[in-house]
Amino acid sequence: MKCLIIAAGQGSRLRSLAEAKPLMPLKNIPLIDRVIDSALEAGVDDFYVVVGYNGANVRAHLEEVSRSKNIPITIIENNEWQRANGISVLKAQPYLNEPFLLLMADHIFDSEIASQLIHRSSENKGIILAVDENLQNTLVDMKDVTRVLVEENQIKKIGKGLESYNCFDTGIFLCDPVLFTAIETSSKNQQDDSLSGGVRILAKQGKAGAMPINGSFWCDIDDPDNFKQADIYLSSLIEKCA
């Protein structure tokens, strides 16, 4: 299974902790390494990473990861990284003509989530998004999280400002290449370059599924508070395993 990781953003709210957000260490392991490790555990064997802000440093790190782990990592440049995240997804279009896992470099997660998505490849018509139905999840930043309204395992609405919703977007997707066309349509017709814009197009076509994560761990490391919460959570896991 191929995997696309978006690592192009600036991460301005974490500049005090790291120059390049994907390289920020959490328990001495860079965020993007944690994402790659979880994907490997889930069965991914071919990586594509879109870099942008501070791309030279991220590229150098990924080249070392590729050598040390003996895994293929294709690095894709996005010189329009200031635009919405859908642009980063589109930069990978020439490389991906089959189903792929889509991940964010700053979203760490239990590998079981990705594994379950991969096992659902045969039923995917557009995208399947892993969603968190725990609306009281203390690791979620309510000011920034993307909200999702799901009915009968189909996405009906998605966006940060939704007033009516029943789960959260974890940033972990199983995608068919039709997603690229959907983002292009959203950009052209709605002037919306975001990944969520593409998902909305697919939702209208009945091609946007949802998979509950049923309590599995995930966290969007978006600011110092999220970072501290994730650090505490991982510390508790280490203590349990000791």
How should these model regions be labeled?
Residues 1, 166-242:
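Conserved alpha/beta core of the MobA/IspD/sugar-nucleotide pyrophosphorylase nucleotidyltransferase superfamily
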Residues 13, 57-60, 85, 112, ...:
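Phosphate- and divalent-cation-binding pockets in alpha/beta enzyme and binding domains
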Residues 66-145:
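Conserved beta-loop-beta/alpha segment of the NTase-like Rossmann-fold superfamily
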